[in-house]
Curated annotation (Swiss-Prot):
The active site is at K135. Homodimer. Transaldolase is important for the balance of metabolites in the pentose-phosphate pathway. The keyword Zinc does not apply. One of its GO terms (molecular function) is transaldolase activity. It comes from Prochlorococcus marinus (strain SARG / CCMP1375 / SS120). Transmembrane segments: none annotated. Keywords: Cytoplasm, Pentose shunt, Schiff base, Transferase. Gene3D superfamilies: Aldolase class I. This is Transaldolase.
Length: 335
């Protein structure tokens, strides 16, 4: 019998949601996604300490011997993400998503500048921009930054997407791909309603992605939909046929170990009837987002949590830099 993972791969691009190189080797996905939390976790795996050290050493060389430790760490944040991205691209045939500093989520020009820098770092290690997706938070400022970047041929993955207004604005901006967060939407509704579980197609995250998918396909938008942040296998199965799904290793393993029959739920060639095309000015976007309490709260929470992960990564890099430059060889940890 064919595994669920193989069946899913025949109708959806399967993406690994991890920075763990061994997990990526195991499941052989088409693409891979990273975020600050995943890079932080991977950076603390002893097997990858050499990648961190190389990133810090390259950053020190770039900023100069007289630069402060803070300047080295600031430079190394991007270097580390690109280093992991480069290693991931040695394994997968497709694209890797690398995220812009979440602390820039409300600054359009700073986001553009950071994205250009990341692409330049990839270029220096002979990675084409065609193999990189720049992850940007789906704020108005982030979406406008992505619109500029796309016009320059820099492809963007708009993340932390929870509401329909965000999806509409992303499509209008012509971004390459969006990542609606299925599981985090479910988390909010469970906390809000006190309901412990939702059956498959009634899962609020599944409902949201299905609505967005059908809206995009019915209105002939080129922006792809990549479901993300899953809490259980049922959410994944209910979105079979979505353009892409980015899946954590623990769920990839479950899919690989099951040979149940998979039914396509979404079809880009046969989308279900959807709303007619909507145009959003900035005021409309902000008003729709404000009225969607779930999307507003989860977007804010996501930016805060990713920002905290970046700060923890900074601490880890600072600690490691001091060890390297003092000749020590202690293992990495944020403790």
């Amino acid at each position: 019998m064919t595994s669920l993972l193989d069946q899913l791969s025949s109708m959806t691009v399967v993406v690994a949601d991890t920075g763990d190189l061994e997990a990526i080797r195991t499941f052989k996905p088409q693409d891979a996604t990273t975020n600050p939390s995943l890079i932080l976790a991977a950076a603390q795996i002893p097997a990858y300490q050499n990648l961190i050290d190389k990133s810090l050493q390259a950053s020190r060389q770039r900023v100069g011997s007289f630069a402060s430790a803070k300047e080295v760490v600031d430079e190394a944040l991007d270097e580390v993400c690109v280093t992991f991205g480069k290693e991931i691209l040695k394994i997968i045939p497709g694209r890797v998503s690398t995220e812009v500093d979440a602390r820039l989520s409300f600054n359009t020009q700073a986001t553009i500048n950071k994205a250009r820098k990341i692409i330049d770092l990839y270029k220096k290690v002979d990675i084409s921009k065609e193999r990189v997706l720049i992850k940007v938070a789906s704020t108005w400022e982030g979406i406008k930054a992505a619109e500029v970047l796309e016009s320059e041929g820099i492809h963007c993955n708009l993340t932390l997407l929870f509401g329909f207004s965000q999806a509409v604005a992303c499509a209008e901006a012509g971004v390459t791909l969006i990542s609606p967060f299925v599981g985090r939407i479910l988390d909010w509704y469970k906390a809000e309603t006190g309901k412990d579980s939702y059956a498959g197609e009634e899962d609020p995250g599944v409902v949201s992605v299905t609505k967005i998918f059908n809206y995009y396909k019915s209105n002939n938008y080129k922006t792809e939909v990549m479901g993300a942040s899953f809490r259980n296998i049922d959410e994944i199965l209910e979105l079979a046929g979505c353009d892409l799904l980015t899946i954590a290793p623990k769920f990839l393993e479950q899919l690989e170990n099951s040979d149940s029959k998979l039914t396509r739920k979404l079809d880009s060639l046969k989308p279900l009837p959807s709303e007619t095309k909507i145009h959003l000015e900035e005021y409309d976007f902000r008003n729709m987002l404000k009225l969607d309490r779930m999307a507003t709260e989860k977007l804010e929470e996501g930016i805060i949590n990713f920002s905290k992960a970046i700060e923890q990564l900074e601490q880890l890099l600072s600690k490691r830099l001091s060890y390297i430059e003092s000749g020590s060889n202690a293992e990495l940890s944020i403790a």
